[in-house]
Amino acid sequence: MEGYKSFLAFLVSSLLLGFLGVIFTLVWVLHWREGLGWDGGAAEFNWHPVLVTSGFIFIQGIAIIVYRLPWTWKCSKLLMKFIHAGLHLTALIFTIVALVAVFDFHNAKNIPNMYSLHSWIGLTVVILYALQLVLGVSIYLLPFASNTLRAALMPVHVYSGLFIFGTVIATALMGITEKLIFSLKEPPYSKLPPEAIFVNTFGLLILVFGGLVVWMVTTPAWKRPREQGMEILSPTVSSPDETEEGSTITDCSNTEKSDVELNSEAARKRILKLDEAGQRSTM
């Protein structure tokens, strides 16, 4: 892999930022909000940001970059497809529970559903994500689609996945801003109390996390090799000079082998000529 150290830096940074985003969400709802529960109250609503951040953002981000991990390139493509689909399915389950939590809370408090832009885009992107998962499994995991169809739809599959991922992060940023505006009264959000600063920082974390994931998955040099027998490059890969040297040694060995074969053939012909001459002299 070209730029292995750069890839490793991006990977570690993205995982750290994503994990910090999950921690920030938990600290937010446990310290400044009402905690977590499942009673139709505010504590049930708090599952919504926690599950969206951990599942729809963090786990989905891992699912997107899992093919780019060079340590998995020796694994079979089928196994990686199962891992890729399994992570996406886990993210979808987290998201569905998050939707149930927010609808339960709204219904228990007689709060209208689906009136804000956040809710419109949020539900739309969940539906698109579910369709993406179903179509991805049907075309790329199950053995029904032809290779031609798979190759033709791959650019659409990749683009729609990145579009959904980016839309999820944008919708999450809208949601946390909306929550702060509704919840912070004394002092208001405009006064930037500690909770506002903390949650704004959380928003920056998931935004940068998304940017790093998109960068890793769109860098051609970090793409998983296509051929089964392709050499897997790692930090300990031989340098081009070493590869050239190995090629030279192989060529030299082949040359020596050819010389030996030629000498053996010449000796055999000389022996045959001597035998023929001996037979003539005897006659």
Swiss-Prot record:
Organism the protein comes from: Xenopus laevis (African clawed frog)
Stretches of the chain found on the membrane's Extracellular side: 31-45, 104-116, 178-195
Membrane topology classification: Multi-pass membrane protein
Top-rank taxon, per record: Eukaryota
Official protein name in the record: Plasma membrane ascorbate-dependent reductase CYBRD1
Region (Disordered): 234-262
Localization, UniProt: Cell membrane; Apical cell membrane
GO cellular component assignments: apical plasma membrane; brush border membrane; lysosomal membrane; membrane
Keyword Oxidoreductase in annotation: yes
Reactions catalysed according to its record: Fe(3+)(out) + L-ascorbate(in) = monodehydro-L-ascorbate radical(in) + Fe(2+)(out) + H(+); Cu(2+)(out) + L-ascorbate(in) = Cu(+)(out) + monodehydro-L-ascorbate radical(in) + H(+); monodehydro-L-ascorbate radical(out) + L-ascorbate(in) = monodehydro-L-ascorbate radical(in) + L-ascorbate(out)
Residue numbers binding Fe(3+): H106
UniProt cofactor(s): heme b
Job of this protein: Plasma membrane reductase that uses cytoplasmic ascorbate as an electron donor to reduce extracellular Fe(3+) into Fe(2+). It is also able to reduce extracellular monodehydro-L-ascorbate and may be involved in extracellular ascorbate regeneration. May also function as a cupric transmembrane reductase.
Gene designation per UniProt: cybrd1
UniProt cofactor note: Binds 2 heme b groups non-covalently.
Molecular function, one GO term: oxidoreductase activity
Residues on Cytoplasmic side: 1-5, 68-76, 143-149, 221-283
One Pfam match: Cytochrom_B561
Residue sites binding heme b 2 per the record: R68, K77, H84, H157, K223
Ranges annotated as spanning the membrane: 6-30, 46-67, 77-103, 117-142, 150-177, 196-220
All copies of domain Cytochrome b561, residue ranges: 13-218
InterPro entries attached to this UniProt entry: CYB561/CYBRD1-like, Cyt_b561/ferric_Rdtase_TM
Main location class: membrane
Assembly and oligomerization: Homodimer.
